[in-house]
Regions:
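Terminal helix-turn-helix DNA-binding modules in bacterial transcription factors
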Residues: 1-39, 61-66
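The DNA-contacting recognition helix of HTH DNA-binding domains
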Residues: 40-42, 46
Length: 66
């Protein structure tokens, strides 16, 4: 997409990777935020909700796999 900034692109990739952590790990939101490249968990939560439509904790509760 030509209208996407570098930051938007990298955030999208980070959020996609964070979905896997949320589904398959017991890591905290802070640990996941750090693992995917966000320095601030609240910023991660804001970006996640903006892109996915729900906060990461709710996403995890709805999509947890064993």
């Amino acid at each position: 997409e030509l209208d996407t900034t570098f930051t938007e692109y990298t955030n999208r990739l980070r959020i996609e990777r964070s979905k896997l952590y949320l589904q398959r790990s017991g890591m905290t939101l802070t640990e996941i935020a750090c693992a995917v490249g966000f320095e601030d968990q609240s910023y991660f939560t804001r970006i996640f909700k903006r892109q996915v439509g729900v906060p990461p904790g709710k996403y995890r509760a709805n999509n947890l796999t064993a």
